Amino acid sequence: MGTQTTNTASQSTTNAQGNGSLPLPQSDRDVEHLQGHWLLARIGKRVLRPGGKKLTGRMLAKTELEGKDVVEFAPGLGRTTQLILERKPKSYRGVDRDPQVVDIITKLTAENAPSIPTSCALRDAADTGLESESADAVIGEAMLTMQTERGKRAIIAEAYRLLRAGGTYSIHELGLQPD
């Protein structure tokens, strides 16, 4: 799978530092064919964190990242990616099925972490193609919520497969309870 994208869309966003203009993923699609989170991004909601930035910070603070091999599922526009890189991991690998996200993350990591080995694979979180037991931490933020039960199980199984003994799968998700 390649990581090339065509920048023909008029919708754009800034990178994690607010610099430059990058095309929004799926901005070439009409509203009826957008994934929900990219529709929200199109209308201005650029960060989807069920518990806000504070919960993201708590999650990352409780996950040992410095000097560790880190995988991030569905990094989106790279807001959490930047926070991960600030914690000086040994390596960073993103995994996303959207080629525009792969392009965004590839640029962001090259600009902001030139001394850290980084990559972003055009793959599904349920089938990353990464080597078994190759990560100390797997990060996923507000992505399981949008999956079917079968999809959730497959993604969790893939995170488990990637983790070394003693590794951590850190997530936070929406938790809806009926009244």
Give residue spans per PLM region.
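Class I SAM-dependent methyltransferase Rossmann-like catalytic core
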Residues: 34-51
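A short SAM/SAH-binding and catalytic strip from SAM-dependent methyltransferases
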Residues: 137-151
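Conserved alpha-helix/loop element of class I SAM-dependent methyltransferases that forms part
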Residues: 49-66
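A short glycine-rich, Lys/Arg-flanked "PGG" loop and its adjoining helix->strand segment in the class I
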Residues: 153-168
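A short acidic, Gly/Pro-enriched loop at the edge of an enzyme's catalytic core
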Residues: 126-138
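Conserved class I S-adenosyl-L-methionine
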Residues: 170-179
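N-terminal, positively charged/glycine-rich alpha-helical extensions of SAM-dependent methyltransferases
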Residues: 2-39
